[in-house]
From Swiss-Prot:
It catalyses: AMP + ATP = 2 ADP. Belongs to the adenylate kinase family. AMP binds at T31, R36, K57, L58, V59, G85, F86, P87, R88, Q92, R156, R167. One of its GO terms (biological process) is AMP salvage. Residues 122-159 are annotated as: LID. Pathway: Purine metabolism; AMP biosynthesis via salvage pathway; AMP from ADP: step 1/1. Residues 30-59 are annotated as: NMP. ATP binds at G10, A11, G12, K13, G14, T15, R123, T132, Y133, K200. It is found in: Cytoplasm. It comes from Actinobacillus pleuropneumoniae serotype 7 (strain AP76). NCBIfam families: adk, PRK00279.1-1, PRK00279.1-2, PRK00279.1-3. The gene is adk. Coiled coil: none annotated. This is Adenylate kinase. Catalyzes the reversible transfer of the terminal phosphate group between ATP and AMP. Plays an important role in cellular energy homeostasis and in adenine nucleotide metabolism.
Amino acid sequence: MKIILLGAPGAGKGTQAQFIMNKFGIPQISTGDMFRAAIKEGTELGKQAKALMDEGKLVPDELTVALVKDRIAQPDCANGFLLDGFPRTIPQADALKDSGVKIDLVLEFDVADEVIVERMSGRRVHQPSGRTYHVVYNPPKVEGKDDVTGEDLIIRQDDKPETVLERLAIYHKQTKPLIAYYTAEAEAGNTRYERLDGTKPVEEVSAELAKILG
């Protein structure tokens, strides 16, 4: 099963990705991890990517797709894979298609912006341990304090409302057009497209996913 996950940051993709990986025994492929691994291993593609990144330049789509193709040719992807964070744009989706990679299923996690802002801006973190809380969904016993150590909790920069809104703006501009792209691909019979309501409780979304995935 070759799957693409679509959805804004904070839409719950990460949680459900774990569920799919455990159910099917397929790896999650993140382009960030791939670049880091290729650079660390010193592969030819890794060297090219590093040279561009060191100059502060964006890695071109052809190079990213070449890395993806390299990665999905590895033995652990024999039964499929889960692409998260790629493709991000229509040119990347076209490049993936042109390179002959067939996607079986595209999953969209649909969550309204205001819900995402509430979800992410309510997160609190105990930095030394990495323990996370949420002021609404998973509050600490004492407001602003870690349950175990009693130390202060912080709001990460990424979770501040203004940062969340910036990330959402980029998502809507760059990635949302992919929803129309893959809906059209599904109508043409090239893939399957399923939309999930990401505002439902995690267990309900997982149960829906289990049905979709059969």
